[in-house]
């Protein structure tokens, strides 16, 4: 596809927005899904102060802004801010005219029907796109791994899902959702660092803690044993320099933080961990396809990027599954972007071209067309 009419692929995550052109092997633009508004009145005349900032600019000015995430738990909750993010994506990041390109958007599994309709409406009525499509995130991740059957454990910043897929179709009755993801782990790390005597409270400081989490945390293969090691020696301690030059030391917090994925009780939640949720999802499927799911368990999303997570999943699921079952956890190195990559693959397939919802179809049927064409 030539750049002129290439389809645009936008993966709107709770934490990061990934955007680019179909056919590319990686997104061109990756920026935080944040809209920031000034906390104080502007006093410098002629500074060209704006009433809102999006993405990296909001991130860099976070000290004077109140930051809001319009996507919570994978689902859009603030449409005005969401529109700002899309506007920023088209005009500032990709520098394209949306009325000239088909747009592929992604959505969380079990997204409310009204949400997909609203997305469709905004694309056609606000941005005048010639065509659009809404695809389920986990399905795209599976495409990116070169499979059509498997179970995807997709965990991002706002929500975690386990989605069994057979021959390209998601099995909705077996999809499970866990409202425990990266943002909760960041908040938990803030809490346990506060117990150490470091104070992180504002939205701006939360971003510092997110960086600590991404750079230093890992998943222990055996949590109790790791705790014992941490208690008896300083071999697991690492230091981190804060923006103001202060250096903090972090020890067992490094693996206590992501351990909450396997033991949600750490966060005071009564739900099952990601290993049990994956197992339960497989058990909701037909007995004949379970073998294929166990052997094709694909991890996707930024919250699966912790070192050690695949080995731990392998160990935990092996303990739950029948003893003779072959279990394979696939953790592609590019899994942070695998939803976007799958979208790029899908939107550039020749067989996909008849799947787009065209402006004409939208004008004839209205927003509900999305339920008939996107499944």
UniProtKB/Swiss-Prot annotation:
Keyword NADP: no
Positions of disulphide bridges: none
Modified residues (Tele-methylhistidine): 73
Location (main, coarse): cytoplasm
GO cellular component annotations of the record: cytoskeleton; dense body; focal adhesion; plasma membrane
EC number of this enzyme: 3.6.4.-
Pfam families: Actin
Enzyme class: hydrolase
Further details from the record: In vertebrates 3 main groups of actin isoforms, alpha, beta and gamma have been identified. The alpha actins are found in muscle tissues and are a major constituent of the contractile apparatus. The beta and gamma actins coexist in most cell types as components of the cytoskeleton and as mediators of internal cell motility.
Quaternary organization: Polymerization of globular actin (G-actin) leads to a structural filament (F-actin) in the form of a two-stranded helix. Each actin can bind to 4 others.
Protein name: Actin, cytoplasmic 2
Species annotation: Pelophylax lessonae
């Amino acid at each position: 596809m030539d750049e002129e009419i290439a389809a645009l692929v936008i993966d709107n995550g709770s934490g990061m927005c990934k955007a680019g052109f179909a056919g590319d092997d990686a997104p061109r633009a990756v920026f935080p899904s944040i809209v920031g508004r000034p906390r104080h009145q502007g006093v410098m005349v002629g500074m060209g102060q704006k009433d809102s900032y999006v993405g990296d600019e909001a991130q860099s000015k976070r000290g004077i802004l109140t930051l809001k995430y319009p996507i919570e738990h994978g689902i859009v909750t603030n449409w005005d801010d969401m529109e700002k993010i899309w506007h920023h994506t088209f005009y500032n990041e990709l520098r394209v005219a949306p009325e000239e390109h088909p747009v592929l958007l992604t959505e969380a599994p079990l997204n409310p029907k009204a949400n997909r309709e609203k997305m469709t409406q905004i694309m056609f009525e606000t941005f005048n796109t010639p065509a659009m499509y809404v695809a389920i995130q986990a399905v795209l991740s599976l495409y990116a791994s070169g499979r059509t059957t498997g179970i995807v454990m997709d965990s991002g910043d706002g929500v975690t899902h386990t989605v069994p897929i057979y021959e390209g179709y998601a099995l909705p009755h077996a999809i499970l959702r866990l409202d425990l993801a990266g943002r909760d782990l960041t908040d938990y790390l803030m809490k346990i660092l506060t117990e150490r005597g470091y104070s992180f409270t504002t939205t701006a400081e939360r971003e510092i803690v997110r960086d600590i989490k991404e750079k230093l945390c890992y998943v222990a293969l055996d949590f109790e044993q790791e705790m014992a090691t941490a208690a008896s020696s300083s071999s697991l301690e690492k230091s981190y320099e804060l923006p103001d030059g202060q250096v903090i030391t972090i020890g067992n917090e490094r693996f206590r933080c992501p351990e909450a994925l396997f033991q949600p009780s750490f966060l005071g939640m009564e739900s099952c961990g990601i290993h049990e949720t994956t197992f339960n999802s497989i058990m909701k499927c037909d007995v004949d396809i379970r073998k294929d799911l166990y052997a094709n368990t694909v991890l996707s999303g930024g919250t699966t990027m912790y070192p050690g997570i695949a080995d731990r999943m392998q160990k935990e699921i092996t303990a739950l599954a029948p003893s003779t079952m072959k279990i394979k956890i696939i953790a592609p190195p590019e899994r942070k972007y695998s939803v976007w990559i799958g979208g790029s693959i899908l939107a550039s397939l020749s067989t996909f071209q008849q799947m787009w919802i065209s402006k004409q179809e939208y004008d004839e049927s209205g927003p509900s067309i999305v339920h008939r064409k996107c499944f």
